[in-house]
UniProtKB/Swiss-Prot annotation:
This is Zinc finger protein 230. May be involved in transcriptional regulation. Disulfide bonds: none annotated. One of its GO terms (molecular function) is zinc ion binding. The keyword Zinc-finger applies. CDD domains: KRAB_A-box (cd07765).
Length: 474
């Protein structure tokens, strides 16, 4: 037989709770504790019969107090299990020894019927096998990994491990495990009851604090206020993120364009702009997006009902935030001001793009010619020069344009609309730029003088034509 110095004891697998800790356990947790402790006894003492149930120290849903390892060392004589009362120290070693004594007959039978011992072992050696739990002897050995075990029940699982057999299946999700102890640990996931439930949406939460935060979405309550600007937030974590806006702390910097961000996930999203990758595609219209969240938001345009409508123009939106942004157009509010020139903007994104004019930053560059732009949309328009793309077609004459603004101006020629009027002569014009040129003709700003003959021309173009003709004659 193979002998090991260290024995597997009840202390190695037992879970100890104080009286205060036991009072905090809910029924599901108590049931889980019972199952785990029962499995611990089974793994170490399973011989097919167990006359003493390890949870006899549960009486009227009150746990008997188990002493710690220090208390066991100093306790020379204690009460028997039957004599110990509730909340009295019941030595774990005493439970161990009495249980092993009760199992002598059944364990002796299994040992005799197993191949614990080699041929030639005498009956006295079999008798010695009854104390294998206390001595730490592990006579059984796995032939594949040479690991030794103290009884047949513990000897079997390693064989299941080598064969890959998973005979223990979870009834909740169907997942299988080699060991029943692993199954017990897995079942703790299902035992975590979701105690908190939202009354509005019916969504369940494992913590009451998460439920309170969720309910504030419906009630509009924002108890956490920023001391700098007074803005309110539903939870403290969002307030902490907001406070970084005032401190200016942006530790995450993009290596390509130098733009800084408060959080690392913001930097990761930003870096997709430089790669140009758009892996998420809408199945309905074919439009592609960099982020899955952007695709999900876009899909609502096709599927979701537009519950939020503008009172001014009746336009519908799927999100209240989009409606709020749209209403700024009707109010004319421009809350975002440039500190350099004082120009105002409706959106913070517009202000950010405008500030690049002052800083000279052009993070978007054309791969064909290297020309830089302050916005992604500007780069997209420029790339049509190289590709020759003209997606905007006039239905009247079939003429194509690369910009939406160009086709809008072109359509005015067909409908004969002349919305712009010269303040000096009253002449109506198609484009605003024509109106400015007309006013320049009246005040003399557009006139150009020839240096050779002194004659003045309304347009610089007319002067250039005359000069070219004069040079050809020479």
């Amino acid at each position: 037989m193979t002998t090991f110095k260290e024995a597997v004891t009840f202390k190695d697998v037992a879970v100890f709770f104080t009286e205060e800790e036991l009072g905090l356990l809910d029924p599901a947790q108590r049931k889980l504790y019972q199952d785990v402790m029962l499995e611990n006894f089974t793994n170490l003492l399973s011989v097919g019969h167990q006359p003493f149930h390890p949870f006899h120290f549960l009486r009227e849903e009150k746990f008997w107090m188990m002493e710690t390892a220090t208390q066991r060392e100093g306790n020379s004589g204690g009460k028997t299990i039957a004599e110990a009362g509730p909340h009295e120290d019941c030595p774990c070693q005493q439970i161990w020894e009495q249980t092993a004594s009760d199992l002598t007959q059944s364990q002796d039978s299994i040992i005799n019927n197993s191949h614990f011992f080699e041929q030639g072992d005498v009956p006295s050696q079999v008798e010695a096998g009854l104390s294998i739990i206390h001595t730490g002897q592990k006579p059984s050995q796995n032939g594949k990994c040479k690991q030794s075990f103290s009884d047949v029940a513990i000897f079997d699982p390693p064989q299941q491990f080598h064969s890959g057999e998973k005979s223990h299946t979870c009834n909740e999700c169907g997942k299988s495990f080699c060991y029943i102890s692993a199954l017990r640990i897995h079942q703790r996931v299902h035992l975590r009851e979701k105690l908190s439930k939202c009354d509005m949406r019916g969504k369940e939460f494992s913590q009451s604090s998460c439920l309170q935060t969720r309910e504030r979405v419906h009630t509009g309550e924002k108890p956490f206020k920023c001391e700098q600007c007074g803005k309110g937030f539903r939870c403290r974590a969002i307030l902490q993120v907001h406070c970084k806006l005032h401190t200016g702390e942006k530790p995450y910097i993009c290596e390509k364009c130098g733009r800084a961000f408060i959080h690392d996930f913001q930097l990761q999203k930003h870096q997709i702009i430089h790669t140009g990758e758009k892996p998420f595609k809408c199945e309905i219209c074919g439009k592609s997006f960099c982020l899955r969240s952007s695709l999900n938001r876009h899909c609502m345009v096709h599927t979701a009902e537009k519950l939020y409508k503008s009172e001014e123009c009746g336009k519908g939106f799927t999100d209240s935030l989009d409606l709020h942004k749209h209403q700024i157009i009707h109010t004319g509010q421009k809350p975002y001001n440039c500190k350099e020139c004082g120009k105002s903007f409706r959106w913070s994104s517009y202000l950010l793009i405008h500030q690049r004019i002052h800083s000279g930053e052009k993070p978007y560059r054309c791969e064909e010619c290297g020309k830089g732009y302050i916005s992604k949309s500007g780069l997209n328009l420029h790339q049509r020069v190289h590709t020759g793309e003209r997606p905007y077609n006039c239905k009247e004459c079939g003429k194509s344009f690369s910009r939406a603004s160009s086709i809008l101006n072109h359509k005015k020629l067909h409908c004969r609309k002349k919305p712009f009027k010269c303040e000096d002569c009253g002449k109506r014009l198609v484009h605003r730029s024509f109106c400015k040129d007309q006013q320049g003709d009246h005040n003399g700003e557009n006139s150009s003088k020839c240096e050779d003959c002194g004659k003045r021309y309304k347009r610089r173009l007319n002067l250039d034509i005359i000069l070219s003709l004069f040079l050809n004659d020479m």
